[in-house]
Amino acid sequence: SADYDGILLSTTGDKSDAIITRDLSKTLTVMPGDCLVIALIDEKAGIKGILHAGWKGLIDGVIVNTINMFKEKGANVNNIRGLLFPSVSMNCYDLGEDVISRFRDFAKELGLNEKEVISYNKEKEKYNIDLRKLALTQIKKLGIKDENMSVMEYCTYSSKDEKGNLKFHSHRRDRTLSMNMALFLGKE
């Protein structure tokens, strides 16, 4: 981890996928493609953070590292609340055989039956992964209560508004980095 003027960066390898601060007045920002973004806060301890959990970061421990940093800074898992922002849903998240074994191992580590979080799409010849369920299971195993977590169920790839227009930019669908979402975690 690294500390920059009260903003802590949670690192996984050589990348930083989470920002934590003890200054609740600071606004934190992340720009995901289709990956999970999770906002966490312990108001009693005065700590908040936002993390980006793509498939690599999720497996490599970004959630564990971030919650451990919260605890190191005085947070209590019983007081941590969180929100999962819109992300690509299981049915739209295609992965190849090259990474699926890592997910099988990860699901097993979390005590999940792989059929709960991994499916095979014969038509596309790809695997589908439920990143949300994997993340929520890991968060629960780290001691954060289910009732303290909220999930925005929208799929960044396929969710449409009432007029039938796509709601979100999707890196996977649009194959471009432009028009990316920006998510902000600020003060009320």
Regions found by a protein language model. Give the residues of each.
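Active-site microenvironment for binding and transforming phosphate-containing groups
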Residues: 1-188
